[in-house]
Amino acid sequence: MFRAQQNAFDDAVAKATDENLTSENWEYILDVCDKVAAEESGAKDAVAAMIKRLAHRNANVQLYTLELANALAQNCGPKIHRELASRSFTDALLRLANDRNTHQQVKPKILERMQEWAQMFANNPDFGIMEQAYMKLKTQNPNLQPPSKPGKREITEADRQKEEEELQMALALSIREKPSAAPEPKAEPSTSASVPASQTQAATSQAVPPGTSAATVSRVRALFDFQPSEPGELQFRKGDIIAVLESVYKDWWKGSLRGQTGIFPLNYVEKLPDPTVEELQREAQMEAEVFGQIKNVEKLLTLLSTRSSELNVQDNEEITALYHSTLSIRPKLIELIGKYSQKKDEFTQLNEKFIKARRDYESLLEASMSHPAQPQYGRPGQTPYGYPGPAAPLGYPQGPPQSDPQRYFSPRPQDQTHMYPPTSHSPDPRGRTPPAGPSFPQHQQPPPDSYQPVHHRPESTYDNPQELGTSVYDSPVEHPSSSQRLPYPPSGAPVPPGVHQQFQHQQQEYPPSGYPPEDASKPPTAGFASQPPQQTLQQPPYPTAPVAHQPPPSHQPPPVPSTASKPTPYPSLTPGTPSGGEYQAYNPSQAGAANSNPNSYYR
């Protein structure tokens, strides 16, 4: 006579946990969440409706009910937490888990959800019933455990080669079977309570099939929640789509999810096949339908906003038709929102990775440019003051000069006051010859024609003093600024006082030298006879630092010349007088003209 009052959530919960669903329908689940949050007694009525669905004998219904309860716990706050931690709901879970007719995939799911809820409610002591029920279930069923994580084993070269062979074999089989492949008949939905359809599919693809490598799989779907226990592992929840990056261990792959990168076990995920051409066309058609209804939605909004509040909407056929036509695109719109939200997240992550890679590249490029590689052949190193440069071994005359780009180099402007003839040791990198004493012990000189240089500079505009016989290298290249150097008078002419004072001032800056400065504007008045290389090697370049293999001079160096005693800067010889092996004077035909025949210098 009296009928029980019908629960307002029975239809919504039954729709969200329908046994004919192939997977969780999040549109229906979110509708239940919104309804629970909107009504005062929504949490109590929703839990009562879920208790009824847990008593259903279909495993799909039981699994969908557990998923709905978890979604309510995540979205509806303390009200639903109190109802989930009630004695009636926990007893219903324990009865289902202890029933021997319950499917084997439902029992681990009950234990997994109760563990999550116990951890979620741990901060509130009023919800301790859930933790007690979880500990009771764990004690009564010690074998109920979530899938264990496989051990991490490094992939050997043989394993990689085997994966490659299996990949090639699978590709060959797919190419061979493609022409004869026939469309498979669609499977009718089963209403039996034995094995759920979604869990059957998950069981077949729970472990990634053998022969499948990270190179052939781009995406996987999580079958269970995974909490990392070690650094470097990727955390995910059931239903997450993970992008596969590479294969790291035997049963672990590396993937990316929500901007995080890490490894995950293969038995927690299932392979997602790449979309086919038909699926892509179907998605494009669905998007076209949604965008085609934009005008109707805007028109409906305009009509509703301009009409008066006294208008009866039910009597207006235009508004009713527009409403029903636009209502059909809501599920498609929600699906597209989820799809493009995921794509947006992926593009955002890709942009962040690109920015990081660009910054790393620019920093490395800047570091390499700030420290350029030194050239293999550069300027010769500077010889320390007081030590001679490298010279030829004793007893061997130096050969003809080679085409060396460093033979001639210009002195720096501040060092162009004096130019000294080159000696057998390497020139100073700063463009000047190391200073030497005014005189050294002279050995017996051979005849002038015993050793003649083989190279000269006939193309020179100025008659520079020719080189000594100690080296066959040409004179350093002169610069136009050489006109600033100190002139010297011809042989026998007195030295002007100003010039002598300037020369004395320069002698204070440099140690006294046995060679006079030269003038680019005047020809030399005396030449120097050639000397064998070994003669120069016997005299130290610096009087204060003798070379180790040379004996030091037996006498003290002469004093610095002063105004009282004016030493002759170079030997003065009368033309036509035989030199007797000492120095041979050379007089040009014209004092101020350039030497037209440089070969006449050596005679």
Swiss-Prot record:
Where's the VHS domain? 16-145
Q: Where is the composition biased (Polar residues)?
A: 461-473, 586-603
Ranges of biased composition (kind: Low complexity): 180-210, 374-397, 498-508
Which Pfam family is one of those matched by this entry?
SH3_1
As recorded in UniProt, coiled-coil segments are none
Which residues are in the UIM domain? 162-181
Tell me the Gene Ontology biological-process terms attached to this UniProt entry: protein transport to vacuole involved in ubiquitin-dependent protein catabolic process via the multivesicular body sorting pathway
Q: Where is the composition biased (Basic and acidic residues)?
A: 151-163
Report the residue ranges that make up the SH3 domain in this protein: 215-274
Q: PANTHER family from the entry?
A: JAK PATHWAY SIGNAL TRANSDUCTION ADAPTOR MOLECULE (PTHR45929:SF3)
* Cited function: Component of the ESCRT-0 complex which is the sorting receptor for ubiquitinated cargo proteins at the multivesicular body (MVB).
Assembly description: Component of the ESCRT-0 complex composed of HSE1 and VPS27.
Its family? Belongs to the STAM family.
Protein name, please?
Class E vacuolar protein-sorting machinery protein hse1
Q: Which gene encodes it?
A: hse1
